[in-house]
């Protein structure tokens, strides 16, 4: 018989830097799971991606055990890294903070493809291009 799911918690944590301090401690502690066990396992799994934010979806079961999956970094972070900026535009419709090429857009779309609701790479590119536009990043 399958275990009964108690909760699903979604967190965005810097890769390799999970610790029991907020926001991880309170989010997981209220469900009674081993926070240090999660932190160690997360840090091992994301050690190769240090410096990026990696979302994790933690499934917590009634017997206080847990499983988690890591996803690809947020599209906004990948776009900021590709454009070489620290933040998007405050007024994206009026000011452009950076320009990225179609090649960079395709590269980001291929990385994000498994997490996006797109049938093909062109659909994924359009989704990422919309995110870029809302951040004030122009695609040429």
From Swiss-Prot:
Post-translational modification: One or more lysine residues are methylated.
Keyword annotations from UniProtKB, A to Z: Methylation, Ribonucleoprotein, Ribosomal protein, RNA-binding, rRNA-binding
Any one GO molecular-function label of the UniProt entry: large ribosomal subunit rRNA binding
Any single Gene Ontology cellular-component annotation: cytosolic large ribosomal subunit
SMART domains per record: RL11
tRNA-binding found in the keyword field: no
Presence of the UniProt keyword Ribonucleoprotein in the record: yes
Any GO BP: translation
Function: Forms part of the ribosomal stalk which helps the ribosome interact with GTP-bound translation factors.
Similarity comment: Belongs to the universal ribosomal protein uL11 family.
Subunit structure: Part of the ribosomal stalk of the 50S ribosomal subunit. Interacts with L10 and the large rRNA to form the base of the stalk. L10 forms an elongated spine to which L12 dimers bind in a sequential fashion forming a multimeric L10(L12)X complex.
Protein name: Large ribosomal subunit protein uL11
Gene encoding the protein: rplK
């Amino acid at each position: 018989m399958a275990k009964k799911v108690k909760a699903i918690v979604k967190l965005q944590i810097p890769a390799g830097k999970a610790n029991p301090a907020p926001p991880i401690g309170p989010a997981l502690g209220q469900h009674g799971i081993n926070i240090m066990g999660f932190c160690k396992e997360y840090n091992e799994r994301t050690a190769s991606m240090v410096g990026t934010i990696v979302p994790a979806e933690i499934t917590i079961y009634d017997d206080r055990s847990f499983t988690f999956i890591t996803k690809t970094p947020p599209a906004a972070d990948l776009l900021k890294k590709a454009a070489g900026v620290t933040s998007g535009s405050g007024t994206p419709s009026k000011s452009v903070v950076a320009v990225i090429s179609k090649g960079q857009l395709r590269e980001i779309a291929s990385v994000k493809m498994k997490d996006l609701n797109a049938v093909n790479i062109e659909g994924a590119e359009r989704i990422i291009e919309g995110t870029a536009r809302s951040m004030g990043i122009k695609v040429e």
